Amino acid sequence: MKYFQLNPECYLITGAHRSLIHNLLTGKILWLDANNTKQILLAEAGNEVNENESTFTELEKLGWGFFSDSKYFVDKLRSTNIYNETKIWKNSPNLFFATIQLNTECNSNCSFCNNIFCPICIKNSYKTIMDKDMFFELINGCIFYGLKEVLLTGGEPLLHPNICEICSYIEDRNISLSIKTNGLIKPINFPQDTKFIILLDNFNDFDKIISNYKGYKNVTILTNKRNDNLALSRLPEGWAVQFFATNLIISKETMKGTNLDEFFLKKLNNPCLFSKLTVLSDGSVVPCLQNKKQIIGNVKNDEFSQIIKKLSLDYWSKPIGERKFGKCKKCEFKYACNSCIFADCDKLCSYDVEAGQWK
């Protein structure tokens, strides 16, 4: 009989009946059945185990754990200070990323418009536009909290009458700039290092988009069309392609391992919302564009510090896996999953937590 322990970089996450081991150095995961889970829990609790038991010998072969003749404490690898997790007075919140909707007007009619999960833009027949002075004041408020990057969206942000002045204001403050666009308007006098995210719905516009943006290198085509590889093969050098699904899919195939930082971001915070701000064209602050009806405040009327405080307490620091309802709470995949706090995972997820099986 010997003792067995998982390596410092290996974390065991238990579910209702099964468990998952995360290796934070390799980014790999290992799914354990109920019996193996029971064996590992006994070992991790400091009990002696049979050194010939396959549960442990296989993990030793993988280099994920080790045997020892005596019991001793293994300090787990972590990216955070334990003191910060338990102290009463928390650190001041940091705001790293802001999504700002400049307008709701758009010169395109995407087939999935306003009918997509986690949209990057929102078109509205009730046209609103963000005043440039309000935008400048908003950016100044964000800079105080450490703003690093801004995503401008709409509608179609290039239709904003002050778009060039707005972009220059961001560039002058050494803030990384990304612009979501449909690619139908040629950008003129934009900073060369601007990141353009072109939402492509119709390949009939493909040649026009290339012509409009061929002078820029930092361009990503965002599309849900996976069947036109011939067109995509003609992209200018340096351009990237990213595919998206119009609906949230939670399946065995979408589960993935995490590295050290990703694991603790998911464990301690909401990775989708953490240190991020989303402001609509009328000044309303929302958690994200997916949940635009949940108004947190308005930058025109409310103290910006109070908005940041509410975001930090009510959204940034609320891990998805720690929700007090639904099956996420007792699921071993909660840190390997792409689930959303605003989605009904009980309906959208194909994993049966109680049975320990994917449907």
Regions found by a protein language model. Name each.
Residues 1-42:
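Acidic, low-complexity/disordered tracts enriched in E/D and polar residues
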Residues 7-8, 295-359:
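Flexible mid-to-C-terminal extensions adjoining Fe-S/redox cofactors in radical SAM and related proteins
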Residues 38, 54, 58, 62-66, ...:
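Conserved alpha-helical substructure of the radical SAM core
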Residues 40-51:
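Short helix-coil junctions and helix-kink-helix linkers
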Residues 66-67, 338:
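Short beta-strand(s) of the beta-wing in winged-helix/HTH DNA-binding folds
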Residues 106, 110-113, 272, 288, ...:
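Short cysteine clusters
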Residues 176, 188-302, 307:
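Radical SAM enzyme [4Fe-4S]-AdoMet core and its adjacent flexible, acidic
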